[in-house]
Curated annotation (Swiss-Prot):
Coiled coil: none annotated. It is an enzyme of class 2 (transferase). GO terms for biological process: gluconeogenesis; glycolytic process. The keyword Thylakoid does not apply. InterPro entries: Phosphoglycerate_kinase, Phosphoglycerate_kinase_CS, Phosphoglycerate_kinase_N, Phosphoglycerate_kinase_sf. PROSITE patterns: PGLYCERATE_KINASE (PS00111). One of its GO terms (molecular function) is ADP binding. Pathway: Carbohydrate degradation; glycolysis; pyruvate from D-glyceraldehyde 3-phosphate: step 2/5. The lineage of its organism: Bacteria, Thermotogati, Thermotogota, Thermotogae, Thermotogales. The gene is pgk. The keyword Nucleotide-binding applies. Its main location: cytoplasm. This is Phosphoglycerate kinase. Belongs to the phosphoglycerate kinase family.
Length: 402
């Protein structure tokens, strides 16, 4: 179902309350990475240029319903002012007299940022009273926070009970690309999964078994699969309570004709730290006790590169190893390069949020793939085939069009 977007509505003179994702990393009151603010700019600018009064809502961190100065959005307001080249009015409140007054006196093109939504306990509880207070400030709600789309909160879901909600450009882009991975993906379709735990990716594997041609498994989760097949994995991280499940997934894949590609070698060490002695060991030979696999090995890199080659749709979620440490970063880097190469040949490539997004940025390949998702948990749930509350609450195309 297509969703209404900010393009579909007349904004002139309208008060627009916009849920953005300004949950940026901070250190000592300074923003260390403003990517999320930059990504919200196109929607904010569009609203300003089309004569709207813009009221922005965002959370930052997890203050758990308490006013904590280190979670204030004041530094965000300053950075946003610089990026927009115009003053952003910051109000250190969420509702009440001061907020009502400022909004009432605002002119077309003005931008107001309210304080951290999570300073009120009602935000994460999706409190209808809180949602109503925000809805009363505006004519229309714009949801541009994909990162919280898997949460039903007052600022993204509750508010849509009172005023119409439409998607911002970032939300629209996320839905468009992630839908390509879950609905009629162009074939061959290859899914690359990594990260530590099978349990985090069960939903994705199960949902994509029917759709993908190949699923490549790296990261620490590979050892649960390998152990389920009887291989000796030494002291590698294994979810022993998921061994039967891993075996079942491999059997299901066989039945469905989906190829699951498991690593054939691994880079091992006795400790997870830089500068330690490393060994590359073939999986068939088994890992000695005390040694753990911390990256895919060179033979696996080659195997994965060949599997990725020629794909028309690629989804990648989760690193191949402990990529933050140089000695264990090669697998993740090589997979990132292989995916970038296929993108240049016309493949649609989608990188799940979180660690994979951090990895692709680290290796300077962010602009060499089709789409890097801004939401870790949200992109994972979308790929699991779940309906996300923050998307469900956005009006459908045919609903308010006339």
């Amino acid at each position: 179902m297509e969703k209404l977007t900010i393009r579909d509505i007349d904004l002139k003179g309208k008060r627009v309350i916009m849920r953005v994702d300004f949950n940026v990393p901070m250190k000592d009151g300074e923003i260390t990475d403003d990517t999320r603010i930059v990504e919200a700019l196109p929607t904010i600018k569009y609203a300003i240029e089309n004569g709207a009064i813009v009221i922005l809502l965002s959370h930052l961190g997890r203050p758990k319903g308490e006013r904590k100065p280190e979670f204030s959005l004041l530094p965000v307001a300053k950075r946003l002012s610089e990026l927009l080249g115009k003053e952003v009015t910051f109000i250190p409140e969420l509702y009440g007299e001061i907020v009502n007054e400022k909004v009432k006196n605002a002119k077309e093109g003005d931008v107001i940022l309210l304080e951290n939504t999570r300073f009120d306990k009602g935000e994460t509880k999706n409190d209808p009273e809180l949602a109503k207070k925000w809805a009363e400030l505006a004519d229309i709600h714009v949801n541009d926070a994909f990162g919280t789309a898997h949460r039903a909160h007052a600022s993204n879901v509750g508010i849509a009970q009172y005023i119409p909600s439409v998607a911002g450009f970032l939300m629209e882009k996320e839905i468009k690309f992630l839908s390509k991975a879950t609905t009629n993906p162009e074939k061959p379709y290859v899914v690359v999964l990594g990260g530590a735990k099978v349990s985090d990716k069960i939903g994705v594997i199960t949902n994509l078994l029917d759709k993908a041609d190949k699923i490549l498994i790296g990261g620490a989760m590979m050892f649960t699969f390998l152990k389920s097949l009887g291989y000796n994995v030494g002291s590698s991280l294994v979810e022993d309570d998921k061994l039967d499940l891993a075996k079942r997934i491999l059997e299901q894949a066989k039945e469905k004709g989906t190829e699951i590609v498991l690593p054939v070698d691994t880079v091992c060490a006795q400790k997870i730290e830089a500068g330690v002695e490393t060994k590359t060991i073939d999986i068939k030979d088994g890992l000695p006790e005390g040694w753990m696999g911390l990256d895919i090995g060179p033979k696996t890199v080659e195997l994965f590169r060949n599997s990725i080659s020629g794909a028309k749709t690629i989804v990648w979620n989760g690193p191949m190893g402990v990529f933050e440490i140089e000695d264990f970063s090669n697998g993740t880097k090589e997979v990132a390069i292989a995916i970038a190469e296929e993108t240049s040949k016309g493949a649609t490539t989608i990188i799940g949020g979180g660690d994979s997004a951090a990895a692709i940025a680290k290796f300077g390949l962010k602009d060499k793939v089709s789409h890097v998702s801004t939401g870790g948990g949200a992109s994972l749930e979308f790929l699991e085939g779940k309906e996300l509350p923050g998307i469900a609450s956005i009006a459908n195309k045919k609903k308010i069009e006339n």
